[in-house]
Amino acid sequence: MISLTDTQKIGMGLTGFGVFFLFFGMILFFDKALLAIGNVLFVAGLAFVIGLERTFRFFFQRHKVKATGFFLGGVFVVLIGWPLIGMIFEIYGFFLLFRGFFPVVVGFIRRVPVLGSLLNLPGIRSFVDKVGESNNMV
């Protein structure tokens, strides 16, 4: 089992609550207060889990400037009160930022008994194969 420090445990909790508030905010027709809270908790939790310096290094790498701009710009747009437009920017930036992790995530989910069989359904399989293929070396 992986050993986590207390700071990392707090970060996991903040990230989990952030994802919950983002999901709940989208279910409730893009409620701007819930989305704003979710954004702040998610970014703060990420900083707690991997550390502040590594978070800055991750977001501000030269080849991720466009992705970071869209993601943080989307967070800002949500915070000023345009949740739908902000979430579109944010989701696009999220996919650009974390696209290197998608093959690993898809490979892991395919090994989970119930979810793996769901990913092999005809309509879903082609989409998952596209998402799960690695275009570049990470």
UniProtKB/Swiss-Prot annotation:
Membrane-spanning residues: 10-30, 33-53, 91-109
GO BP term (any one): endoplasmic reticulum to Golgi vesicle-mediated transport
Keywords assigned: Acetylation, Golgi apparatus, Membrane, Protein transport, Transmembrane, Transmembrane helix, Transport
Subcellular location: Golgi apparatus membrane
Membrane topology: Multi-pass membrane protein
Residues the record lists as N-acetylmethionine modifications: 1
UniProt-listed Pfam families: Got1
Lumenal face residues: 31-32, 90
Chain ranges on the Cytoplasmic side, renumbered to this chain: 1-9, 54-68, 110-138
Highest taxon above the source species: Eukaryota
GO cellular component: cytosol; endoplasmic reticulum; Golgi membrane; protein-containing complex
Family the entry assigns: Belongs to the GOT1 family.
Task of the protein: May be involved in fusion of ER-derived transport vesicles with the Golgi complex.
UniProt-recorded name of the protein: Vesicle transport protein GOT1B
Naturally occurring in which organism (per UniProt): Mus musculus (Mouse)
